[in-house]
Amino acid sequence: MSAWAPPQASPALLAVLAASCLGTAVWEEIAFRRLAMEAVAGALEEGRTRRLMAACVCSAVFTMLHLPEMGAALPAALRAVQVFLFALAMAGLVEQTGRLAPAIAAHALYDAICFAPAVLGISGSVWEISASSLMAPETSMSGMLASLLFLAPAAALGVRRLLAAR
């Protein structure tokens, strides 16, 4: 029995993965956490929950755009919760720091963790990507639940920051 060795990825493949994760993070954070969030917040009545309501609206749209067609109801529902929690966490991070750069870095890192195993040909793990869509990285129930456990406290902190906002 030989020892497991990670698959070898070409530098070009790793560069494409990095550029894709970073480019997606930059575009989505600007679009959702800066432009859309400010537009929705500006349209809402002043008040303690204005920023949180704007974040929830933008997070719902973000979630809808990230849901692939999925057959089973439970994985689809968990994926929706996962994406929504991620979006709230990013909104809270932007609110806390006043900058997009930390959210862009966190978003790019999260995407890299989700997509690198599939790009590198690693399968059979909690990160295995379904054959039907690259938009659903956590196809195993344990991977999905682990991701939700990681995202829930970050989203709760995001909500707290949004409620404390201007």
Residue locations for each model-derived region?
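Helix-boundary and loop/linker segments of multi-pass membrane transporters
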Residues: 5-14, 44-48
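Membrane-interface helix caps and helix-loop-helix hairpins in membrane proteins
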Residues: 2-8, 67-76
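Membrane-embedded alpha-helical segments of multi-pass membrane proteins
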Residues: 11-19, 27, 31, 80-88, ...
